[in-house]
Amino acid sequence: MTFVENRIYLASRSPRRQELLKQIGVDFMVLPLREALPRIPDVDETPLPQESPPEYVERIARVKAETGRKRMSERGWADFPVLGADTAVVLNGRIFGKPENPLHAKQMLRALSGQIHEVLTAAAVAAGNGTRVCLSRSSVRFRNLGEQEIDHYLACDEAYDKAGAYAIQGRAAVFISGISGSYSGVVGLPLFETAQLLEESAIRIFQ
């Protein structure tokens, strides 16, 4: 299916994902999945029983994209592809989503301290020709963190809407001694894989 305009809907309120799309020149409009207060998920992000971390993020990204496309259709909006994404931090098979409160955030950072964890980000594009999903996997190494610096970091308030309670593009960059994989994927949207999905829906990055 070819779209008249080189434009997409982004089914996310994430400022990081918006900035990443701007970085590669994608013309997009934000499509909130429902009217919601900040920090309330647009979809139910509860993992299913026996669901692996990769299956989890791929499912949530798909649901976000397809829910956005359903809303687009119900409201009679212009027919553009809908991009959804989801990120999870995984340590020893355990999924770390967004922290529920400051204590939860502190527990996450304590667990990540001195460890190598995996960051999974799935992107999904729902269009007239179906839904395509991609998965980015990256490894991130944290140095050992002291209690005081964890407290100071949490006081800066950048942790609470991030998977794993940290922002690699923010002050938490000083915690990270190494990364293998996709930096943009760790931030929240793997640009290489996302560009490939968009190309498959006739959205050209360079035209």
UniProtKB/Swiss-Prot annotation:
Obligatory cofactor(s): a divalent metal cation
Reaction catalyzed: dTTP + H2O = dTMP + diphosphate + H(+); UTP + H2O = UMP + diphosphate + H(+)
Record has Cytoplasm as a keyword: yes
EC number assigned by the record: 3.6.1.9
GO CC terms of this entry: cytoplasm
Gene Ontology molecular function terms on file: dTTP diphosphatase activity; UTP diphosphatase activity
Compartment(s) of residence: Cytoplasm
Important for substrate specificity (site feature) positions: 16, 87, 169
Residues of the active site: 86
HAMAP family named among the record's database cross-references: Maf
Protein family according to the UniProt entry: Belongs to the Maf family. YhdE subfamily.
Protein name: dTTP/UTP pyrophosphatase
